[in-house]
Amino acid sequence: MPVLPGTQRYPHQRRRFQAAGGGAESGKRGSEEAPGVAWSGSESGRDAATPAW
């Protein structure tokens, strides 16, 4: 699997991105800005990520 931009800084969080179901980009944004907060335009991602945090 290719390393996506931004994941190298947080290699331990790549699993969280995948578990969130919102894709690497939305997962990265949510993780960097405010973990656990609803990501704009990603309702399903938020719901799936809630138990993960």
From Swiss-Prot:
The lineage of its organism: Eukaryota, Metazoa, Chordata, Craniata, Vertebrata. One of its GO terms (biological process) is mRNA processing. Interacts with HNRNPA1 (via the RGG-box). Interacts with IGF2BP2. Blocks the binding of HNRNPA1 to the intronic sequences flanking exon 9 of the PKM gene by competitively binding to the HNRNPA1 RGG-box motif. This inhibits inclusion of exon 9 and promotes inclusion of exon 10, suppressing formation of the PKM M2 isoform and promoting production of the M1 isoform. Also suppresses HNRNPA1-mediated processing of microRNA 18a (miR-18a). Promotes MYC stability through interaction with IGF2BP2. Residues 1-53 are annotated as: Disordered. This is HOXB-AS3 peptide. Signal peptide: none annotated. By blocking HNRNPA1-dependent PKM splicing, inhibits colon cancer cell aerobic glycolysis and suppresses colon cancer cell growth, colony formation, migration and invasion. Promotes the proliferation and viability of oral squamous cell carcinoma cells. Keywords: mRNA processing, mRNA splicing. InterPro entries: HOXB-AS3.
